[in-house]
Amino acid sequence: DSTQALTTAWKEACASASPSTILVPKGNFAVGLITLEGPCKSSIGLQLQGTLKAPADPSKIKGLGWINLNKIDLLTIFGGGVFDGQGKSAWVQNDCHKNGPICKTLSMNLRLYAVTNSILRDVTTLDSKNFHVNVIGCKNLTFERFKISAAETSINTDGIHIGRSDGVNIINTEIKTGDDCISLGDGSKNINITNITCGPGHGISVGSLGRYKNEESVVGIYVKNCTITGSQNGVRIKTWPKSEPGEASEMHFQDITMNSVGTPILIDQGYCPYNQCTAEVPSSVKLSKISFKNIKGTSTTKEAVKLVCSKSFPCNGVELADIDLTYSGKGGPATSVCENIKPTIKGKQIPAICSGSAAKAA
C-alpha cells in the first residue's frame, strides 16, 4: 500500500520553498483515502506516470473523495497516468432509483476544494465509484487533454462536476461515462468548455438547480466545438419544480455536433428524477440570456429540441440560430416542444422551432 509514501512525499514537497514535483513512476500502486493539503510554500507538481488504484471495496473509503486536493495554489498534475477508482462492483450500490433512501454515497475519484491557478493535463480517471471529478470552491483551474472513462451502465459517474467555482476551463478532453459528461452546479461562473468529445453519457448539463436553499447563481457558461455521441441528452439546462429561488444566465452553446443523441437541445424546468418531487408547482429558477448556435446532427428521439420553461418565470432572452437536427425513426421527422418561452430564431431551423401548436403561451 502506497498511501503513506505518497502522503509523506506530498508533505515534504509542500513544505519546500522552491518549486518541486512528486514522481509516481510507471506501475500499479494501491492507495487508500488520501488528502493532499495546502497551502504549500511554492508551486507543486504531481507527475503521475503509473496507475493509482483505489480499494475495490467501497466501504474502505470513508468520505466523499478518494483523492482529495484541498487549498492548493499553483498545482500541476500531469504525466499520462491513471486514477483507477475500481468502481465496477460498487455501481449497483449507487442506484438511487432502485435503492431509494438507502442509496449509498460512494467516493469520487478526485475531489478538488479551493484549488487555484492550477492545471490537470494528460491524465485519466477510470471507473470511479461516483463522480469522477468534483470541483468545489476553485478558481482559475484548467483540465486539458484530460480523459474520463467508465461504462455506459455505470451509475452516477458524472465526468466533471463543478460548483461554486470561477474560471474553470475544460479543453481537448474525452469523456465516456454513465452520467453527465460535465455537470455545472450552483455558483458556477465563467466556465469554458471547448473541444470536448462526450459519449456515452448524459451530455453536458447545467444543473440540476433549485433543489436546495441558498444556491448561488450560475453565470457565464460557454460550450463550444464539442461532439456528443450516443448520449441520452446533448446540451441541457435542468431545474427542479417547486424549487428554491435561483438564477442562471449567459449560457451559450455553439458549434456542436450531435451523433445519435437522445434530446440534442433541452431546457427542462420540470426536472424530476424518480418522481421524488412535486411537479405541479413551477420552478422558481429564472433562466435568461441563453443561446444555441450552429448545432447539427442526428436525434434518436422525435422531439429533437425541447424547451420547457417555468410557468412562473418564463425563459427570457433565448436565441436559436442555425439548428439542423434530423430524426429518422418512427413518426418522423423531428419536432420541437416549447412551453413558456418565446425565443429569437435565426438562420436554418430544422426542426421548426416553437412554431404553430408547439408554442404554448409565454
Swiss-Prot record:
Catalysed reaction(s)?
[(1->4)-alpha-D-galacturonosyl](n) + H2O = alpha-D-galacturonate + [(1->4)-alpha-D-galacturonosyl](n-1)
- Tissue and organ distribution: Pollen tubes growing through the style during pollination.
Subcellular location as annotated? Secreted; Secreted, Cell wall
Which residues does the record list as glycosylated? 140, 192, 195, 225
Spell out the Pfam families in the cross-references.
Glyco_hydro_28
Could you name the Gene Ontology cellular component terms for this entry? Answer: extracellular region
What keywords tag this UniProt record?
Answer: Cell wall, Cell wall biogenesis/degradation, Glycoprotein, Glycosidase, Hydrolase, Repeat, Secreted
**Is Repeat tagged as a keyword?**
yes
> Which residues constitute the catalytic centre?
179 (proton donor), 202
GO MF entries: galacturan 1,4-alpha-galacturonidase activity; polygalacturonase activity
Q: State the family it belongs to.
A: Belongs to the glycosyl hydrolase 28 family.
Q: What does this protein do?
A: May function in depolymerizing pectin during pollen development, germination, and tube growth. Acts as an exo-polygalacturonase.
Q: What is this protein called?
A: Exopolygalacturonase
Organism of derivation: Oenothera organensis (Evening primrose)
